[in-house]
């Protein structure tokens, strides 16, 4: 099978951004035994994009195109692809639902451009985008295959690894099996550095790292004659990865961080209450996602105002006056106060500056403190986060749950 990589985007032609997608795809396709014969880059121009598709399919069996799936008027890869194959664009309801949920979760307004992203080429199969808004597609037409993926690497790479790789491997003989390790508490780059040599030397199984909203993921994939053989191959690699990453790995597969936390609370027969300031109830909402959590989670209090922290959580006024509401001292007192108020074994708290206003040189936007009280023992974690208000609140929530998880593991 001859493959061509088609990169779409005027910014690539102008040199405004580096085309890392082509490099990544070429390397991974080579590892999968699929030769890449051509690389083409074309701007956001419908006539030139259509011509690029004509040339590509005149010499290749499969074209993987990245970019041009965004919400703006010059994102036309799907439209041109539909025209090239003489097909219509049709609304994919499940993709529209995912996009709406993506925006609602972040408190953002949905635009017509975003709705446009839910349209797919008639007769194609959808590549779900769990990392952004634009779904990809796989279109088989005769003996030709077109695969469309978003341009942002943080979306393209995990979509390729999660959905496209199994599709491509289906053309080869044998069994394909994967395991996903979920990592929290370290960034994607730090995690990758820890296992860099394994990634470079492994061809079967392969190891693919990528990020997903405050956590990192490692997908280990093996090809073998039987599922049992593939599992054995994967287990050897997973065992080595676990030695290097330790309890940064919180789970496997589709296990969520909150599910792991609730499972630990259950095993240790502990109850918890939560005091939130900058997160405004997000931590509690994550825990409540887990069925059966009511046995362990007794309640929460959103103490946004300093007077509420003092009156309801018994945070000493002198602590706020001396150290401020955004401080380790305040966070720990909030955690202790909510545990005592609700009579729980554990108290968890979060206080910080989510922005966009409120920051100072000493305490910038993104400074967050997480407090933890476990049966009389107090601890805290300081975070220095970046991004907009919603991102800071989301990452605080994830870090708070992970800090709690680690506290429970140490009991």
Swiss-Prot record:
Source species of the chain: Dictyoglomus thermophilum (strain ATCC 35947 / DSM 3960 / H-6-12)
Pfam families per record: CinA, CinA_KH, MoCF_biosynth
Sequence similarity: Belongs to the CinA family.
Stored InterPro entries: CinA, CinA-like_C, CinA_C, CinA_KH, Competence-induced_CinA, MoaB/Mog-like_dom_sf, MoaB/Mog_dom
Taxon lineage: Bacteria, Pseudomonadati, Dictyoglomota, Dictyoglomia, Dictyoglomales
Protein name, UniProt field: CinA-like protein
């Amino acid at each position: 099978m001859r493959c061509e990589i088609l990169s779409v985007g005027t910014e690539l032609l102008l040199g405004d951004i580096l085309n890392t997608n082509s490099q990544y795809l070429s390397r991974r396709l080579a590892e999968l035994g699929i030769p890449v014969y051509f690389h083409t880059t074309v701007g956001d121009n419908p006539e030139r994009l259509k011509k690029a598709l004509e040339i590509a399919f005149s010499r290749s069996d499969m074209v993987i195109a990245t970019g041009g799936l965004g919400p703006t008027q010059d994102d036309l890869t799907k439209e041109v692809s539909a025209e090239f194959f003489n097909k219509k664009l049709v609304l994919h309801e499940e993709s529209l639902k995912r996009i709406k949920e993506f925006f609602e979760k972040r408190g953002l307004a949905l635009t017509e451009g975003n709705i446009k992203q839910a349209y797919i080429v008639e007769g194609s199969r959808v590549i779900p985008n769990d990392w952004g808004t634009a779904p990809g597609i796989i279109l088989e037409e005769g003996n030709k295959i077109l695969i469309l993926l978003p341009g942002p690497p943080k979306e393209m790479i995990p979509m390729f690894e999660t959905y496209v790789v199994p599709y491509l491997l289906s053309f080869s003989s044998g069994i394909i099996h994967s395991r996903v390790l979920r990592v929290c508490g370290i960034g994607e780059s730090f995690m990758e550095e820890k296992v860099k040599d394994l990634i470079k030397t492994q061809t079967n199984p392969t190891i693919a790292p990528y990020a997903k909203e405050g956590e990192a993921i490692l997908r280990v994939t093996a090809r073998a004659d039987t599922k049992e053989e593939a599992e054995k191959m994967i287990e050897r690699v997973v065992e080595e990865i676990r030695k290097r990453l330790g309890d940064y790995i919180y789970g496997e597969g589709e296990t969520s961080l909150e599910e792991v936390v609730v499972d630990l609370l259950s095993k240790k027969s502990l109850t918890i209450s939560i005091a939130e300031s900058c997160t405004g109830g997000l931590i509690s909402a994550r825990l409540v996602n887990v069925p059966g959590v009511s046995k362990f989670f007794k309640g929460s209090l959103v103490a946004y105002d300093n007077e509420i922290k003092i009156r309801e959580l018994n945070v000493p006024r002198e602590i706020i006056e001396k150290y401020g509401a955004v401080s380790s001292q305040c966070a720990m007192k909030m955690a202790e106060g909510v545990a005592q108020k609700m009579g729980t074994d554990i108290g968890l708290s979060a206080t910080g500056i989510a922005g966009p206003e409120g920051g100072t040189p000493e305490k910038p936007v993104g400074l967050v403190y997480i407090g933890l009280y476990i049966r009389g023992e107090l601890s805290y974690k300081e975070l220095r986060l970046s991004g907009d208000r919603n991102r800071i609140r989301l990452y605080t929530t994830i870090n708070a749950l992970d800090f709690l998880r680690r506290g429970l593991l140490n009991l």
